[in-house]
Amino acid sequence: MNNMNLYSVIKRRFLILTVILVISGCSHSISNDEKRLQAIEQAKPVYASNAIRLRITAVPQLNVFNNMSNSCTILIAQAEKREQLDKLLANPVLLRNLFAGTGATEQILQLDNYVMMPGQSVSLHIDRAEQARYIALIAGYYPAPDNTHTRVLSLPLRLEQHGWWNSAWSAEFVPMRINLTLGRYAITRSDFSAGNTGDEVVFPGQIVFPGQTAESGSDESVLRK
C-alpha cells in the first residue's frame, strides 16, 4: 500500500470516528436532558421547617375602601398540584369562606393567614408542607380577590450533576424567599428567589406576573445565584 492509499484509509477512518463521536455526543446530550427532567419530576417534596420565608410590606394606603385604608388578610395555601390551587382561586364562595375561617380545605395541604395593617412590614417563616409543590398567596382586597390579588408560585428545586461522561442528576426542594408588596388596590410587586451562590435552581412550571423581577424566572427557568 503506497503512502497515498494509506493516507486515504486513515482519513476515512478518522472521518468515520468523528461522525460516531458526534452522534454519540448528541445522544448523550438528549439522554442527559431526560435525566435532568426525571430528577425534577422525582424529587420528593418533604416537610421542612421554616422553608418559606415571606417578607410582606404594605403601603400606608392599603386596601382603600370609601377613601379609608383598611387591613388586608393574606392567605398562604400549599398544594401538591397547581390545578388544585387554580380550582380554589376560581371559587369565590370558597375563598370568601376561607377568609372568614369557615371554608373546607380539601386538597389544600396547609393554610396559613396573616392580617396586614396599613404601612406594616413583617417577616414570616412558614413550614413547607409534606407533598407540597405549589404555594398560593391570596390578598383579601375589597370587594373580593381577583387575579391582581393572587400569586401562585412553584416551590424551588436545587439541581446537582454527578459524573461527567455518563452523568446523573439529583434534585431536592430548598427554602425559598418571597418579597411581597401590597399596594393600594392590588399586589404591586412580588419577587422570589432560592439557593446560594453557584447553585442551579429551578422553579418548575413557574408563570411570571407583572411586577416580578427578572430574578423570578419563567417556565422551568434556571437561576444561578
Regions found by a protein language model. Give the residues of each.
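Bacterial N-terminal signal peptides that target proteins for export
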Residues: 2-15
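Structured domain cores in non-transmembrane regions
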Residues: 73, 77-147
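C-terminal motif of bacterial Sec signal peptides marking the signal peptidase cleavage site
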Residues: 22-25
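Short, solvent-exposed beta-strand/turn "edge" segments of beta-rich domains on protein surfaces
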Residues: 43-47, 61-69
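Short amphipathic, basic-aromatic surface patches that mediate peripheral association
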Residues: 54-65, 81
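Bacterial signal peptide processing site
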Residues: 27-30
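Post-signal peptide N-terminal segment of mature Sec-exported envelope proteins
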Residues: 35-57
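Glycine-rich, aromatic-bearing surface loops/beta-hairpins
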Residues: 150-225
